[in-house]
Amino acid sequence: MEHKIVHVGDIPVANDKPFTLFAGMNVLESRDLAMQICEHYVKVTDKLGIPYVFKASFDKANRSSVHSYRGPGLEEGMKIFQELKETFGVKIITDVHTEAQAQPVADVVDVIQLPAFLARQTDLVEAMAKTGAVINVKKPQFMSPGQVGNIVEKFAECGNDKVILCERGSCHGYDNLVVDMLGFGVMKQASNGSPIIFDVTHSLQMRDPSGAASGGRREQTVELAKAGLATGIAGLFIEAHPNPDKARCDGPSALPLDKLEPFLAQMKALDDLIKSFAHIDIR
């Protein structure tokens, strides 16, 4: 199978290339915190030689509770992203939730993300495709790996073949997610070799049935990330925070920021090893 390359600026993202890190914070909590977190990521990834794209949301439109923090909104969010790009020279990925957001966001960031809950919404797909931006599709928790080909085809029919696919776990009963490691290979086949990245952070979510926000299992970040990279994929998607217990969204799944460098050092070593192996074709 041929591995498709999607370029994020000068970064080639593909399943047979060194892994790209799509990472940052869950939601923009403040300009200063975004600057702090982005600076740390840039410092660590530069040191380790890992291609990097900063991630944050400007509007968490899918929060469980109407009382939960959503973010600074479109206008302020784009100002923060622009400052991050100018200050650190970093690429940026963020999610959009409506057709009207697609072009204004694509005018600022490098990758626009289709949220898992909205992955079948054709009008949103069309609006995102028309921007010409690189697209990151979060595979829905309710969708089998083989069905992602339909989403890739939908974008292609709308004129955009610059699609990255993101695994983020599948529903396993109520309030739990599991990751099927066989699914990475199925997604590659179903999408004709599209780049696959692995959202480790959100795959670690575990909801409290009586709560208004997701719980998580961040203590298992390392083992899950290692398992995903061992399948030979294009990248990892993670979120970190200086104080995860105080994060305004998904703190229980977030990596403590001071663990970022040792975590990424191990991930790079594993990825380099896996991609040094010759492919064994078994039919």
From Swiss-Prot:
One of its GO terms (molecular function) is 3-deoxy-8-phosphooctulonate synthase activity. GO terms for biological process: keto-3-deoxy-D-manno-octulosonic acid biosynthetic process. InterPro entries: Aldolase_TIM (IPR013785), DAHP1/KDSA (IPR006218), KDO8P_synthase (IPR006269). Keywords: Cytoplasm, Lipopolysaccharide biosynthesis, Transferase. It catalyses: D-arabinose 5-phosphate + phosphoenolpyruvate + H2O = 3-deoxy-alpha-D-manno-2-octulosonate-8-phosphate + phosphate. HAMAP family: KDO8P_synth (MF_00056). Belongs to the KdsA family. This is 2-dehydro-3-deoxyphosphooctonate aldolase. It comes from Vibrio cholerae serotype O1 (strain ATCC 39541 / Classical Ogawa 395 / O395).
